[in-house]
Amino acid sequence: MKTTNVKNNNNNINNTDEEIKIKNNYNQNDERLKKIKENKFDWALFKRFINIIKILYAKPVIPLTLFLILFGNGFAQTYVSKFTGILLADIYASFTSGDKVFFLSSVLKAGFAIGGSALLAAIINFIVSIMAWNWRKTLCLYIQNVYFKKSLFYKILAFDDRIDNPDQRITSDIDNFTTLLASIVSQCITGPMVVVYYTYLCYTTIDWYAPLIVYGFFFLGYLINKLVMSPMVSINYLQDKLEGDFRSLHQRIRNFSESIALYSLSKEKQHPEKRFDNNDYDHGYESDDSDQSCDESTTIINRKKNKGSQYYKNKNSTSKKINDFIDKLSGDSNDQKEELLVEEEQAKIQFEALLKNKKRVIFWQLGLNTTSDLFTYLSPIANYFIIAIPVFFLNNKSVLQPGDVTVQSYNCIMLASGFSQYINVSQSISDLSGYISRISSMIEVCKKIMEDVSLDADITKLNEKVAQTHNNDAIINTGSSGNISLNNGDSITLDDVTYFTPKGNQLYSKISINVKRGNNLLIMGPSGSGKSSLIRIINGLWPFFKGSIDRPENGDMFFLPQQPYLIFGTLEEQILYPFSKKQKRIPKSIMRELFQRFEIDYLLDRERFIKKSAQVNDLTHNWLNQLSPGEQQLIAIIRLIYHKPKFALMDESTSSIPQSLEERVYYVAKELGITIISVGHRISLLKYHSTLLRFDKDKNWYLEDIINQNNQSNNINNNNNNNTNKIAEDSVFD
């Protein structure tokens, strides 16, 4: 190999204000914790709620129709309930008069009235369920559309700590929010009707003081509930976050169950005296391993578990006594001496944090339920006190008839029930508030990322750069100081590119390379040196902060990761991805030829057997578990060959396949005109590339020409040549 260019960037690292700003943008944990504390029942929460309502009613025909139907049924139910009170009074009157016929007719009429009310209540519940279903559909599709646009989901998962567990927010949080909202809307529709109608009846059957006393009684209840409910918003918000974290931990254990089991076996074979001390792991724990920062960072070993557990210690002695008491009731014990797996220990710590906050929810819920139930159960006493006022306190010596007592009592109770709906719904509102905060914050952060506000780019400098390009539409603004321009697919050029890890640590500066079509580039270096990071930057997944990149359009580039991504679908759908069967189809003969070319045509036979066995679910859901890592990589390579891009970015994409097949991959790619930028460690990769970009542990980079002494075409037999040419000439690639 001949070294043509050597660059050392150690002297080029300047902590400018711009770089400091960039680093700070990735340290968002404090901001997220601050947002948890700031979630409370206030005007800001109401404005967030209004923004969600605008989304739900963006297409107003169906939701407004359901709302009007609900309103009509609520009005009918309120009106029918009036006759229930009158008929109950008639039943009491029949007892005093001894009129049997009048009694039977009153019971029959009351039965019809109550039956009608029950039917209307069932219809209302049905409409509420339909409203929740429609709202969930609207809101979920809206957020999913934003979430998947321009790979926004990757930016959120890789860079942004402000949104924890976005999967939970899209799935369960939206479902719970819409269900609660529909229930609250139903009560808020019927509640005002009941209040207005029975305010009038109480005024006409008793006097002005009757509705006034009921109003004052429940206004006092509202104030008390407001004081109790406000802190519960942030507590419920935190509880939802902890529930999501706990679920994600077990999801990760499920995904890496085999690796965890194998590691645990090796742990059992080690003797305690031969193991490293925990202090050995503390030194140099925080590394700049950018390649692993987005994939597998913290689930294998938690070397800071002692510090993490101290966070959950209870500092309040009174609360600690209560917690210990509850632990005794539940049978918890801290005397367990059995050595736990790291994953079990992490799950235990996470679960303890979840339970601790759940206790807070339970205690605050106790206060809220107490105040709500207190005013609900005191309402009958307030009712009889109102009826007693004209008899005992206004010198009105007339004795009320049983029928009058029944009607007046019923009217007061119904008025109180209208207010009770608002008191009882306060618990639902506290839960709803947490969902509002989580859903709206996700929408807000997604919009900010789409607008590049989250990266806090220097707008002045961005405008200057746009002006310098004469407003060229081909310039893609990355929200940072780096620019990506698109060409016709002839080359990939990096000019003075400087990039960082997601934590804000600089990797390399002023990288300049030019990869022309037909000249493969190999990137080599130690693990964690930033090789994969450079691939992500070229793809546009990661921002870079200095320099420029000139590359083909996305449709002319194809990315193959080390761990292939297999969708839920058939083998044909695996090859078509990222397209679907609705957009393209592959003839069976071409499928067979492609799979034979890379010696995995037996998978097609296996698929045919699965279809004959009618194991459709196994076919569409378990390919990832059924295939070896090498088979998965070969399917991804066939996907690349089928799509035939101008450039392929391969991140150790052949690490699990034999070298004979690896050689075939590069030869087929060359025959099809696919230029490859490879990341790898194998020395055997050198002969397939013309240029080497080498990184070292000191953050130096070297660009070298590769003198290939082997003619790779001589290593592949003529039969392979004929097959390759046949595939390359097939119209399916055109």
Swiss-Prot record:
Annotated TM spans: 52-72, 112-132, 177-197, 204-224, 374-394
Coiled-coil intervals: 332-359
GO biological process: fatty acid beta-oxidation; long-chain fatty acid import into peroxisome; peroxisome organization; very long-chain fatty acid catabolic process
GO terms of molecular function: ABC-type transporter activity; ATP binding; ATP hydrolysis activity; ATPase-coupled transmembrane transporter activity; long-chain fatty acid transmembrane transporter activity
Keywords per UniProt: ATP-binding, Coiled coil, Membrane, Nucleotide-binding, Transmembrane, Transmembrane helix, Transport
Sequence ranges of Basic and acidic residues compositional bias: 271-286
Cell division as UniProt keyword: no
Catalyzed reaction equations: (9Z)-octadecenoyl-CoA(in) = (9Z)-octadecenoyl-CoA(out)
Major localization class: membrane
Record-linked InterPro entries: AAA+_ATPase, ABC1_TM_dom, ABC1_TM_sf, ABC_transporter-like_ATP-bd, ABC_transporter-like_CS, ABC_transporter_sub-D, P-loop_NTPase
Any Pfam family matching the protein: ABC_membrane_2
Localization per Swiss-Prot or TrEMBL: Membrane
Domain ABC transporter: 492-729
GO cellular component: ATP-binding cassette (ABC) transporter complex; peroxisomal membrane; peroxisome
Domain ABC transmembrane type-1: 63-351
Biased composition (Low complexity): 712-725
Membrane topology type: Multi-pass membrane protein
Amino-acid positions noted as binding ATP in the UniProt annotation, renumbered to this chain: 525-532
Residue segments, region Disordered: 271-296, 712-734
Family: Belongs to the ABC transporter superfamily. ABCD family. Peroxisomal fatty acyl CoA transporter (TC 3.A.1.203) subfamily.
PANTHER family documented for this protein: ATP-BINDING CASSETTE, SUB-FAMILY D MEMBER, LYSOSOMAL COBALAMIN TRANSPORTER ABCD4
Name listed for the protein in its UniProt record: ABC transporter D family member 1
Gene name of this polypeptide: abcD1
